[in-house]
Amino acid sequence: MSRTSSTVDSPQKDAGSAPSVKSNGLPWPLQDHAAVSAATIDGLYLHIPFCFHKCHYCDFYSIVDAEHAPGEAAEAASQISGHSPTSPPARAAVFVDRLIAELTELARLFTLHPRTLFVGGGTPTLLPADQWRRLLDAMKGLGILQRVREFTVEANPETVTLPLTQTLVEGGVNRVSLGAQSFQPALLATLERWHDPASVGAAVRTAREAGITNINLDLIFAIPGQTMATLDADLDTALSHAPSHLSYYSLIFEPNTAMTQRLKMGQVQSMDEETEREMYAHVIERLAAAGFEHYEVSNWARKESSEFKVQSSELRNQPSATDLNSELRT
């Protein structure tokens, strides 16, 4: 969905490659970590790849098909963009089947009692509520949720509905990360983001109504056509929503993305380095003045609510990649 998030950046591999398996039966990324099978996994990342649109800057693994949007999200998206995704696909159920099977195996191999759990994408909130219930119930049954202190789900603003958010809260989700990116329609159009800027505020209100008060906003600066004035306007709007956390990334022209192709064709121009540095410095200054702790390059948390932890181990599970990393900050 977006180049996010506040706590976890997911690794990407060739979407066409399947993990190789050695004689001990573990996928290749886990071969060198078999010795930690008795250790506790402190952080877990799950990847839900479905999207109904590929944003031009995004290089994350995703499956783009209008059929992936469930009914309520489809209606919201069609009102905003004129596109009309259809009802939930059967493949969502198949995906959840396989994800549950893999989590079951991982729970057998590792002590899978994470303190932090992050579900990214893709657009995780395109999974229908019934599939979310299946996944959450399975994780509860496997004991994965018993030690979780922070359970984040990534969402595009237009997919946040009260029934779905209530389902997530009932399953233990206590944090949402919203892909706002910008509040300027022209800049959203440059990024090929379909949502209405007003949908971010609506999503924040919906999350809070459902009981989620820990809210992150993802934003991007150094967007082609952005000025210091529009950057300030984005900061003003973001802060008006009183998030507990902000992730602010500079736009990266990743290889093999539509944005990079547009750059090569002269359709967009990248920000000059000096202006980009000035924008970053301005973000740092504004957020410090607003009471945010700058604890990582692109991440800020409110000082009164921040909790920083260094993970001893984190397991990332997603289509085409499984990875175990050490000493990651969340």
Across the structure, where does each feature detected by a protein language model lie?
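Residue-level signal for threonine
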Residues: 76-79, 257
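Intrinsic-disorder-associated, low-complexity terminal segments enriched in Asp/Asn/His/Tyr and depleted
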Residues: 9, 14, 83, 317, ...
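C-terminal scaffold of the Radical SAM
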Residues: 28-43, 61-72, 87-107, 112-309, ...
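Local cysteine-cluster metal-coordination motifs and their immediate loop/turn environment
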Residues: 47-62
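N-terminal [4Fe-4S]-dependent radical SAM core
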Residues: 1-45, 73-77, 85, 110-112
